[in-house]
Regions:
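Active-site-adjacent structural elements that line small-molecule/cofactor binding pockets in enzymes
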Residues: 1-236
Length: 236
């Protein structure tokens, strides 16, 4: 069941970020997360390449395999295939982004001599795998991508991060490139810096703080949070 009310708006992330790209100049534009196996990989590759090109290389793909089986039923995508589809789709999209003429022959995606233009500004689109499970940690390692387990104890987060790095090494990827992100529910309030320090100690490099924590007085609260927490946390 989706959290919140049935009437709660959930905008399409890529359209939302295209709007933000037009009204900003430096902020990174990331999905958190985009459910890749629910989309056509060639169309998605084109959309992401266009967004990265128009934003000057600011796009960061946070992806997941999905969790709500009813969504997959509505889209006529087998729920049991979502992990394998994600791996195949990412490989296909990377081929389109990184080659002038791309070919890919996988379990679910097959194409020959395909051109995706405009190309992304980034040499390689930044990718982070979301999910607080061993499967997600292993996927991050296999793909040589960042890893974002949104929840979990410090011990559990440390264990999953280690698994992602071990898997990366097993598949010939540099473990040091597995950028570790964590949810920031605890990095808010009077103990924010203490929690940020604890997360930093277990290897977390980026903390994502939910925007709804600032909903009452957004502009002033974000500015205050920047001064009291973000600036100080950057030196940890």
């Amino acid at each position: 069941k989706m959290p919140g009310r049935d009437s709660a708006p959930i905008p399409d992330p890529l359209i939302w970020l295209a709007y933000l790209a037009a009204v900003t100049t430096t902020i990174k534009l990331a999905t958190g997360i985009l459910i890749v196996p629910q989309r056509n990989p060639l169309v998605l590759a084109k959309e992401i390449a266009t967004l990265d090109n128009l934003s000057g290389g600011r796009f960061h793909l946070g992806l997941g395999v999905g969790w709500l089986e009813e969504e997959f039923d509505a889209l006529n995508v087998p729920f049991s295939e979502r992990g394998r589809r994600t791996d195949d789709y990412v490989a296909a999209m990377r081929s389109l982004w990184e080659n002038e003429t791309a070919s890919h022959h996988g379990e679910f995606v097959n194409f020959e001599n395909c051109i995706c233009s405009p190309r992304p500004v980034q040499d390689r689109i930044a990718v982070t795998v979301g999910g607080h499970s061993e499967a997600a940690a292993r996927r991050a390692g296999r793909l040589g991508a960042g890893f974002f387990p949104a929840t979990g104890s410090h011990a559990e987060l440390r264990r999953l991060h280690l698994l992602a790095r071990e898997t990366a090494e097993k598949f010939g990827n540099d473990p040091a490139t597995i950028e570790f992100t964590s949810g920031g529910y605890g990095v808010f309030g009077p103990n924010a810096l203490d929690e940020a320090q604890k997360l930093s100690d277990i290897g977390v490099e980026r903390i994502v703080v939910p925007s709804f924590l600032f909903f009452k007085d957004t502009e002033n609260l974000v500015a205050q949070y920047g001064e009291e927490v973000i600036q100080k946390a950057q030196s940890l």
